[in-house]
């Protein structure tokens, strides 16, 4: 596999409503920041969910959901403290709001979520090798390596 004969494609999959602004915000940054930001999101995911337990945040998120599309995701991101999280990592508040107001990007993320959901993808991570979806219990590296070798990787 270290020979370069295996290629890896990462596709972000929004399962929950709050995943849409997260996915859009990761795409906001320069390309070279994409994977470092993804790692930051996954590394801090539990902490990022804490605001969801706060009734005031829940109320603000619900209010954001009723806004017009171009205002919805900036307001949701602000309510959930995502804008603040990304600002600390180089995506300014203005840049974040501009990206989140781009309805085409948010719609693309939502459409992909629907398409992947209809294809039976319902969790992250989901690994697909040559069209075959690995069972979730095979998401550890030794099992992935075994599946890659079975698919022809050397």
Q: What do the PLM-derived regions correspond to, one by one?
A:
Residues 1-73, 117:
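Structural alpha/beta surface segment adjacent to cysteine/selenocysteine redox centers
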Residues 70-154:
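C-terminal cap of thioredoxin/glutaredoxin-like
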């Amino acid at each position: 596999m270290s020979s370069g004969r295996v290629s890896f494609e990462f596709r972000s999959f929004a399962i929950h409503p709050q995943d849409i602004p997260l996915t859009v915000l990761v795409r906001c940054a320069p390309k070279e920041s994409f994977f470092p930001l993804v790692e930051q999101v996954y590394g801090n995911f539990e902490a990022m969910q804490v605001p969801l337990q706060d009734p005031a945040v829940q109320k603000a998120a619900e209010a954001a959901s009723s806004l017009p599309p171009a205002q919805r995701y900036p307001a949701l991101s602000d309510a959930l403290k995502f804008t603040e999280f990304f600002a600390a990592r180089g995506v300014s508040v203005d840049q974040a709001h501009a990206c989140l107001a781009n309805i085409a990007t948010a719609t693309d993320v939502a459409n992909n979520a629907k398409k992947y959901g209809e294809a039976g993808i319902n969790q992250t991570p989901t690994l697909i090798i040559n069209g075959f979806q690995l069972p979730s219990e095979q998401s550890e590296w030794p099992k992935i390596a075994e599946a890659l070798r079975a698919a022809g990787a050397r």
